[in-house]
Amino acid sequence: MGTNTLVKEFVGRKDHKDYIKRGTAAENLLAEEGLRRGYIVKPSSEKQNMYDHIDLILTKGDKKFTVDVKARRTGTDKSKGFDDLWTVVEFKNTMGDSGWLYSKSDYIAFERKEDFVFADTKQLRDMCESIVDVTKRVASFRNANYKVWGRSYQGKKDLISRIEMSKVVALDKTFIWLKNLDKNE
């Protein structure tokens, strides 16, 4: 991963420690990619991050956009590593409030092995609301493809689903930034 530390690691939720580390690393890697492309990259304020789901603000000339960065996710079997074919979408967060699908960011950027997929937030939300059956609640994350699952057994109020990344990539406002995988340039 990159060496940029523009985004500082969030301290708090011990139950998400590893995911927070991965998330911060993904945010910093995307920040590096933005800088490499000539953008001015600024981290969001703590308030923007917590309440608006905005991680980074990118500016280049008169073009400015905000991003909520999602680190690579493991699939339904964590022992098999990362799954770039499917991703998680969050309708409600662990507190039961609007999840990051209802972000105020312009884009949700999904990290994959070799790139970042930028999905227009409204377009992604509209698609998810039409293809995910939020009335079909399943008992296991393994069964949450286009259905919803939550961790109420842990006292959490989240509502999440899994969708295929190919559907995100197919959205007409989606764009992709390849990662600079060769750091020896």
Located regions from the model:
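Acidic-basic catalytic patches of nuclease active cores, encompassing PD-(D/E)XK
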Residues: 2-47, 73
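Non-catalytic C-terminal interaction segments of nucleic acid-processing enzymes
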Residues: 2, 113-185
